[in-house]
Amino acid sequence: MDNNTKKKIAAFLISVGLVTGVSNYEGFRDTAYVPVPGDKITIGGGFTTREDGSPVQFGDKITRNESDIRLTKDLYSYRVKIGQCIKVSVSEGQANAFTSLSFNIGTGAFCNSTLVKKLNQYDYQGACQEILRWNLFQGKPLKGLTIRRQGEYKQCLS
């Protein structure tokens, strides 16, 4: 097997790892629900909008396979979008951590964050540290977000 093929296989495995990691953080529900009081209606692997961009509504349903396919497509899209505001080279672990974070907080919030400012000044440690600040929902720390951010932080340092 040549090096080019090995790199392609490694990239595929890493993206499977990203999808699996985000899927584990988000969980899966086949019927629309509200994850925590005050949050948006969510379905599948953390989607708050339907594929057409309209908001998820109670009664909406999705299969695990549909959710996995959409999550894969969405994560690719998020990675491309955050790549437009990241001006420095990052490791695959950092790219996965930043993609996971942006999937959760949105690309606008990510690209306008102190994290990206630090990253683009080559402060990789400081950028990774910033991930931990994104554990609040309605101004209060949320256990699930804290656990997720700690995982993303560790991945960012890898």
Which positions does each model-derived feature cover?
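Long, amphipathic alpha-helical surface segments
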Residues: 1-39, 47-54, 62-73, 79, ...
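Active-site-proximal beta-strand/loop segments in catalytic clefts of secreted hydrolases
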Residues: 26, 44-46, 101-103
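Active-site nucleophile-His-acid catalytic modules used for acyl/amide transfer and hydrolysis
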Residues: 77-109
